[in-house]
Amino acid sequence: MMEFQEMFSKYQTQYRQLMKSGQHKDAVVPLTTLVSLLDTTTIHQVSPIPEAAIREQKALLLYDLACCYALLGHKRQALLALEHSVEDGYKDYNNMANDNDLRSLRKDKKYQSLLAQVQGRQPIHVLRHSAPYARDAERLNDGKPLFIYQPKESMNLRVVREYFNLDSVAGTGDELSRIINLLHFAHDKIRHDGGNRAFVEMDAIDIYNYCKATGKGVNCRQLALSLCEMYLSLGIPARYVTCMPADPNDYECHVIDAVWSSELQKWLYIDPTMDAWVTDENGTMLSIAEVRERLINDKPLLLCETANWNHETPQTKENYLDNYMSKNLYYFVCKRVNRFNAESMYRDYDPRDDIQLVPVGYVSESQHCEATTDPDVFWAKP
């Protein structure tokens, strides 16, 4: 694996420097070498790198190769490389449509056909063409709650509450202000790093202390799990929700929190990674289900002004909701039991612990996980 990484890094650095300096003819050699390297590698069989990630990287390299050929005036080779890029899943429509490196191809019918394929992969397009939900009469009539919420009086949640002094953090204001204060607290205290999964116990205290001791961040799952425990410790029902894309080869998802508001009588969309919540045009906070529905039907959505990544990058509605979250709101997964340390490293994972909300006809990779097509069942009042 080390040899592969060193070779890949070497040729990647070469071609990027050559492209940056306008030496597109010379950049073709390291680019084709990289494509060949990914074509023949079996590294996904002996490392945590998913095969889908290799294919995605190959699509990006082929796209850059197409740009080089187009700038050199080699139209046939450019279109062939672009076709292979699209076959391997290239999906950045805005980049492809506006990239001046490809301007010599724009009137070509083959280019236009490839661009149309990429447009169909845009997250908002996929979401708007998803199948509808359907009533799940069996579970509705069952009467048993799908989800359980650990009471705040439990010893572990009491420890969380006292450790972080959460009564003081939440404040004495109304319910919504308390929910938002806890969001800000988690966002400020636990840094995000999407590429790092801290190998600690999966509870708010251990995760916080890991960040404090190492100066490192944690992934969105560990952040959302931590904030979920904080809400539960104050008696506010909450779940951390894995928001999933439609594409089974897309290994990137996002995890946020659904927090119950007794005042609004609904689950609220709360994202500790981005310090974010979403409102309608009247300023009313929305649920995850409402955000999804409004994206599908192109209704107004307002992202809170505080939305940011690690206090470094402000978030916009267009980038965060229209692009990123529209990809990750295709289906949802929640834990059946919402509690302290819900994913302990010392417990074996059991797919029966999870419940999914999926569109009609969609079958996810986790076929052993219980699923429903009924949002009323999945988002039932706690």
Locations of the language-model features?
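Low-complexity, Gly/Ser/Thr/Pro-rich intrinsically disordered linker/tail segments
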Residues: 296-382
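Flexible helix-coil transition and linker loops at the boundaries of alpha-helical arrays
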Residues: 1-2, 37-55
